[in-house]
Amino acid sequence: MELNGLRVSRETQARLQHFAALFQKWAKTINLVAPSTLDDLWHRHIADSSQIFQICPEPIRWADLGSGGGFPGVITAIFLAELQDGWAHLVESNHKKAAFLMTALRETEARGSVHAIRIEDAPAEIGECGAISARALADLDGLIGYAAPWMLGKENCRGFFHKGRDYLREIDEARGRWEFDLVEHKSAVEQESVILEISNLRRLV
């Protein structure tokens, strides 16, 4: 099996398929993603989320902010299980969604844990990480603000943020408050979308 050109082992494929089935079951009772996208779960959410691990396939500590339905946090944790190293810390303050995430990580035997706390409280609980991820959470300025406690002054910590067609405007707005190195990774799933890789973060104001 391949996802966006990434070769996926049988074990990882089985984990992803189990997660997809679990997701569809839970989505009937709690709002995990927009209902209109459920029929395209593999393409719109699973394949899209896997792109972050393709960009950064390293056994490091991740903090996934506002994990919601598990994208990209659970997907990253599933890929880390194949490496048998690294860890994904999923931050989700909604307790129903956090319960789903805990179930998903346990049943897929993924390498991750859930923190049912506010994002602002997460840095003190989680500690240092090598990567921060988020998808459909806030504008870039807001995301950088959330990630700043991990990233400021830390050359080895990078942010990976999914963004849609307005990403250039969001970059301009964020540069009014922050200075950072930026790599734009074009999405292999959504034509007008990107994954923004942020590093060497400095605060301007």
Curated annotation (Swiss-Prot):
Pfam families to which the protein is assigned, alphabetical: GidB (PF02527)
Reaction it catalyzes: guanosine(527) in 16S rRNA + S-adenosyl-L-methionine = N(7)-methylguanosine(527) in 16S rRNA + S-adenosyl-L-homocysteine
Its EC number(s): 2.1.1.170
Positions with a binding annotation for S-adenosyl-L-methionine: G66, F71, I119, E120, R135
Keywords: Cytoplasm, Methyltransferase, rRNA processing, S-adenosyl-L-methionine, Transferase
Keyword set includes Nucleotide-binding: no
Record GO cellular component, one term: cytosol
UniProt xrefs under InterPro entries: rRNA_ssu_MeTfrase_G, SAM-dependent_MTases_sf
Compartments, as annotated in UniProt: Cytoplasm
Keyword S-adenosyl-L-methionine: yes
GO MF terms, alphabetically ordered: rRNA (guanine-N7-)-methyltransferase activity
Enzyme class: transferase
Family that this chain belongs to: Belongs to the methyltransferase superfamily. RNA methyltransferase RsmG family.
HAMAP family in the cross-refs: 16SrRNA_methyltr_G
Protein role: Specifically methylates the N7 position of guanine in position 527 of 16S rRNA.
Protein name per the record: Ribosomal RNA small subunit methyltransferase G
Gene responsible for this protein: rsmG
